[in-house]
């Protein structure tokens, strides 16, 4: 255990309140800072509440980012993890990017042309791009990446993002065609994210299954090392010189390096920010939403927040008894006060949801609230009696981050009030995903972030990668397939609305709330953007004196 881990270990602070833990860790880290300084280590770290300069110039420096958990892998084709995506977004480049209005921005692809009734897209690639291992990023590399993503042997959980993509065809060294079996209106959602980023063929072939622990891309930062349950270090890629409208900087990143530091517990993580052991807390659930008031009171710390394109909800497993019964699903939905869940899980920092499509999505069903089951414990008890579902004992699987744990504890108490006993199984996010895919529990806490209503295909289609309720409904599948082919926005939105109506009527989900994307940064951190799509890029970030 490192000195930092030892000083922030919650086991040494048993019996202390959250605020007392934060203070105690701040005190310890301040003492550590003084010892480092007196020992001549050169680590000029500001003590809690002080405004001591961290770095003296725009170029250079190491940025330390606090997070709650480790990724499961850094192979973009082998995970759906938010934490992984946050990391390999820095390491890899995608074909395009998108702005807040949905406009498609050139990135690796400088231009594109739709052909063959929108079933073929020809991309012109940026010249002179190389991977971190020195090999060229050309059409062959793109074709290799696509082939691997689609290969059943890869068993990619993000293959669904590719839609009806069948293969990529090399035209010349800098021209590549993506060939689809049908028009695919949401292709930019995937191509604009890191799950479809371009991989180094040489590195994949050399490393095999170890590629996810030693990723090689072409992005603004290169992978250097990974110490499990401790942190990941990336260093600047001095050959990343290109720009699009999401980047201000057309030269290599300002920072020498960035480190992701794993601090599982909220109080030590906030204390590390207060004492300048870390300069940023960012990423999924990294800033505890029930503690935003405390973060706002921190000196020399800036809190950035915005409503997320997200939804947190309780999935009912329709292949298991008793949640295969619609009356039971309705009863469980009516027994839970989702406002109470949001207040205690997020400190009220969210927006209630009534559809599996989160409230911040433009395509959310306008009358979802009117159609959704109302909180009514008495009616919930009556429905359980009608269904013959008495003395129920159910297992609820969830990731072990603070917000999800708190939400599940409220759900547990609410269901106990109507005679349902719930055993919570809280495990690290990667393990929870495995449990969810196996479908061994009747209840599963699920959340997502996405940028388009096509997320319903992922959640509710029989082939959906996040269909944790194992729903199978031919009409829903047909609508979800057709909306992917419909280029008329009004017609497509009508299909997405119809799917939401079915999902609400069938109680496949109990939508709870959308959270906010919250980031806390030291005031030395400049040009940091809390982006609309929750994708954080560190290429523009710099540290001031």
Model-derived regions, located:
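Extracellular/periplasmic solute-recognition and catalytic clefts
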Residues: 167-168, 224-235, 261-320, 343, ...
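Alpha-helical secondary-structure segments
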Residues: 138-147, 173-179, 219-220, 252-257, ...
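N-terminal secretory signal peptides
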Residues: 1-32, 46-47
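Surface-exposed binding/hinge segments that line
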Residues: 124, 159-203, 209, 220-227
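Gly/Pro-rich hinge or "lid" segments in bacterial periplasmic/extracellular proteins
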Residues: 100-103, 192-259, 267-268, 377-378, ...
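Structural transition elements
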Residues: 221, 351-386, 403-406
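N-terminal lobe/hinge region of extracytoplasmic solute-binding protein
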Residues: 66-116, 147, 216
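Extracytoplasmic/peripheral linker and loop segments enriched in polar/acidic and small residues
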Residues: 119, 327, 421-432, 457-523, ...
């Amino acid at each position: 255990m490192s000195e930092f881990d030892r000083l922030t270990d919650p086991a040494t602070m048993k019996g202390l309140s959250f605020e007392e833990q934060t203070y105690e860790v701040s005190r310890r880290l301040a003492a550590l800072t003084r010892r480092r300084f007196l020992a001549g280590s050169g680590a000029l770290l500001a003590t809690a509440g002080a405004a001591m300069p961290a770095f003296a110039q725009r170029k250079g420096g190491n940025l330390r980012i606090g997070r709650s958990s480790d990724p499961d892998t850094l192979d973009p084709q082998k995970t759906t993890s938010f934490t992984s995506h946050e990391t390999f977004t820095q390491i890899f480049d995608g074909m395009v990017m998108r702005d807040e209005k949905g406009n498609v921005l050139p990135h690796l692809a400088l231009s594109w042309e739709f052909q063959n009734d929108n079933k073929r897209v020809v991309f012109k690639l940026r010249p002179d791009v190389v991977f971190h291992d020195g090999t060229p990023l050309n059409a062959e590399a793109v074709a290799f990446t696509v082939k691997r993503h689609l290969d059943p042997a890869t068993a990619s959980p993000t293959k669904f993002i590719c839609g009806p993509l069948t293969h990529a065809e090399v035209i010349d060294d800098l021209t590549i065609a993506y060939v689809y079996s049908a028009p695919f209106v949401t292709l930019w959602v995937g191509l604009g994210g890191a799950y479809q980023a371009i991989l180094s063929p040489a590195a994949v072939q050399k490393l095999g299954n170890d590629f996810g622990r030693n990723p090689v891309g072409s992005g603004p930062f290169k992978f250097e090392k990974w110490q499990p349950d401790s942190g990941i270090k990336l260093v600047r890629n001095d050959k990343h010189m290109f720009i699009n409208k999401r980047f201000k900087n057309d030269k290599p990143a300002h920072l020498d390096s960035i480190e992701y530091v794993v601090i599982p517990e909220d109080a030590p993580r906030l204390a590390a920010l207060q004492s300048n052991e870390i300069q940023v807390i960012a990423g999924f659930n990294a800033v505890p939403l029930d503690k935003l008031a405390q973060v706002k009171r921190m000196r020399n710390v800036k809190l950035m927040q915005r409503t997320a394109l997200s939804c947190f909800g309780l999935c009912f497993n329709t292949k298991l008894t008793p949640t295969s019964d619609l009356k039971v699903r309705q009863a469980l939905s009516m027994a839970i006060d989702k406002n109470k869940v949001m207040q205690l899980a997020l400190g009220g920092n969210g927006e209630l949801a009534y559809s599996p499509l989160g409230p911040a999505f433009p395509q959310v069903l306008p009358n979802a609230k009117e159609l959704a089951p109302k909180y009514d414990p008495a009616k919930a008890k009556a429905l359980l009696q009608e269904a013959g579902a008495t003395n129920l004992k159910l297992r609820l699987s969830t990731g072990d981050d603070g917000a999800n744990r708190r939400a599940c504890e409220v759900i547990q108490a609410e269901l106990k009030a109507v005679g349902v006993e719930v055993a919570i199984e809280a495990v690290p996010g990667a393990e929870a995903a495995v449990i969810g895919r196996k479908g061994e529990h009747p209840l599963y806490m699920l959340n997502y972030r996405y940028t388009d209503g096509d997320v319903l295909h992922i959640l509710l289609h029989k082939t959906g990668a996040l269909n944790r309720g194992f729903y199978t409904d031919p009409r829903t599948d047909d609508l979800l397939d057709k909306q992917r082919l419909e280029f008329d926005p009004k017609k497509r939105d009508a299909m997405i609305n119809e799917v939401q109506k079915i999902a609400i009527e069938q109680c496949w989900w109990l939508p709870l709330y959308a959270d906010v994307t919250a980031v806390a940064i030291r005031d030395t951190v400049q040009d940091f953007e809390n982006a609309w799509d929750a994708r954080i890029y560190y290429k523009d970030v710099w540290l001031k004196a």
